[in-house]
């Protein structure tokens, strides 16, 4: 299993019926994708897995499409909530962060998350970035010192208006809000209100899905009040430069990780020419509950810093259990690690991405999980790979028919149709639809094999042998496409398929999805004389409910 590390991804080559610039040594563009950084007050749950798998899938696809990709994830380690949790456990806040952030790294390793940096807000370069940005905004007059009096939700680390309270409780988490009064530095939101509205109007892809845009506009149109961005009532945070009785508000701190991660320090020193290219392409993956921070406060912070706001903020829904939000008190939190241990990482990745349309809430049900696993993965995909490998070994000694054997164009057209619309689907984060189309292709191929019944053909008869070889060639090349198509979503399964069929790895330079001619030459798809493995690993063993 691949263990992620701190690295720049290799630039990969693809010819998925799209133009690219690899012949000239150029790249197709830059792509920067981020997850939220996760609080270290507790171990990761399925919602953390969901956000991260979304980001990982599009990062993998963009790499395959010839983009220079940077994928950032990490942990949010400051704030009153962390300070209180550490006190309850009898440890220091840094000690708590050190122990819990490892659990996120372990989960991401188990899920085969291909991040380029795992950032911690306690990292030295991040602390410098936050203090540099704060100082710049103070010098520009976008930050000023005054006094804050109002409501605050500690679990959500957010300031609340009197109007937003629900019987004195936070409208987001339902817990009791507290009244606070203290000296504070403020960020001028009202100064940039019109500029933000103009940006939203002029960039239709800024907030996805589109219906979330109305929520943001409604909030902004009520009139933005300047935001308190420092606290004096606790100590666990980044000190305000020149005024260390204040610590910087956790959200101001956290949002700036997106600059730290791609080298803001070097950028302002004139040593990072890629910074602007990456940030112009940034896609933030966030939960719907933190959209306000990313679509309102963050763009205004960037306006004040002289940086263009994000290209896209993708706000996904929540995973519920029995229609209720997961919580420790209800005992309904789904542990992703236990699911991975039982079903494997790709089964969880597949379920999370195929079960709901991004932007909407989903209801996790273990019985439904098992049904989807057995029907889609074990029966449809697993059986297809197993039977195709078995037939090749039985009828051709494991040799994939070569260029002299044509494919069935009607079957391969299904793959072509999926490939031709792939870029737009990924840009819309329409993962459920992509997976639906992939599994429709899998079912088409299974039906083709069943209807053709190659096991009834006599390989000693020249005419029947020709038909048989065409079926086997069509199946093998189709599985090549399937392996490519599922790679961003189910990388471990794709690699297993490539191992069985001796396919060139997709995460190495120089691979191609299809030759330009319809009848693919075996050597351009497969390697080492086009001979597959003698034994095909069972990809997804069936699961019984009583297990």
Question: Which residues does each PLM region occupy?
Answer:
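Short Cys/His-rich "knuckle" micro-motifs
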Residues: 163-166, 178-184
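N-terminal Rossmann-like or analogous alpha/beta NTP/dinucleotide-binding catalytic cores
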Residues: 20-144, 157
């Amino acid at each position: 299993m691949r263990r992620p590390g701190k690295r720049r991804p290799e630039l990969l080559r693809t010819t998925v019926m799209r133009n690219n610039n690899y012949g000239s040594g150029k790249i197709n563009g830059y792509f920067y994708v981020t997850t939220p950084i996760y609080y270290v007050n507790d171990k990761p749950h399925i919602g953390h897995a969901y956000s991260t798998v979304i980001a990982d899938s599009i990062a993998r696809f963009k790499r395959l499409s010839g983009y220079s990709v940077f994928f950032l994830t990490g942990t949010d380690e400051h704030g009153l909530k962390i300070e209180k949790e550490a006190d309850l456990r009898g440890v220091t806040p840094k000690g708590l962060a050190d122990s819990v952030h490892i659990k996120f790294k372990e989960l991401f390793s188990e899920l085969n998350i291909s991040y380029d940096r795992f950032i911690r807000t306690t990292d030295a370069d991040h602390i410098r970035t936050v203090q540099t940005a704060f100082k710049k905004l103070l010098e520009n007059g976008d930050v000023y010192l005054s006094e804050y009096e109002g409501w605050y939700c500690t679990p959500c680390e957010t300031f609340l208006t009197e109007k937003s309270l629900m019987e004195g409780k936070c409208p987001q988490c339902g817990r009791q809000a507290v009244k606070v009064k203290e000296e504070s530095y403020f960020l001028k939101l009202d100064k940039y209100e019109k500029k933000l509205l103009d940006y939203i109007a002029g960039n239709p892809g800024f907030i996805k899905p589109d219906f979330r845009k109305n929520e943001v506009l409604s909030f902004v149109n009520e009139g933005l009040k300047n935001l308190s961005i420092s606290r004096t009532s606790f100590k666990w945070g980044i000190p305000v430069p020149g005024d260390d009785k204040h610590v910087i508000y956790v959200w101001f701190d956290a949002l700036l990780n997106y600059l730290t991660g791609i080298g803001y320090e070097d950028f302002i020193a004139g040593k990072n020419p890629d910074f602007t290219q990456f940030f112009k392409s940034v896609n933030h993956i966030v939960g719907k509950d933190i959209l306000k921070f990313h679509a309102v406060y963050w763009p205004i912070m960037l306006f004040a810093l002289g940086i263009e706001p994000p290209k896209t903020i993708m706000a996904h829904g929540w995973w519920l259990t029995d229609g209720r939000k997961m919580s420790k008190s209800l005992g309904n939190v789904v542990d992703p690690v236990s699911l991975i241990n039982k079903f494997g990482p790709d089964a969880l990745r597949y379920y999370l991405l195929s079960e709901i349309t991004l932007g909407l809430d989903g209801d996790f049900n273990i019985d439904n999980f098992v049904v989807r696993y057995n029907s889609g993965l074990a029966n449809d995909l697993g059986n297809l790979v197993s039977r195709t490998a078995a037939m090749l070994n039985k009828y051709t000694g494991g040799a994939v028919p070569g260029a002299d054997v044509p494919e069935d164009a009607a079957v391969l057209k299904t793959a072509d149709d999926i490939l031709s619309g792939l870029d737009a689907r990924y840009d819309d984060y329409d993962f459920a639809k992509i997976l639906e189309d992939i599994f429709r292709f899998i079912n088409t191929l299974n039906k083709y094999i069943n209807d053709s019944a190659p096991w009834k053909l006599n390989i000693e008869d020249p005419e029947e042998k020709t038909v048989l070889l065409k079926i086997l060639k069509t199946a093998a090349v189709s599985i090549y496409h399937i392996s490519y198509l599922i790679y961003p979503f189910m990388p471990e399964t794709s690699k297993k398929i490539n191992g069985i069929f001796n396919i060139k790895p997709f995460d190495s330079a120089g691979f191609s999805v299809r030759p330009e001619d319809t009848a693919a030459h075996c050597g351009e798809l497969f390697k080492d004389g086009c001979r597959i493995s003698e034994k095909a690993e069972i990809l997804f063993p069936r699961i019984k409910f009583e297990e």
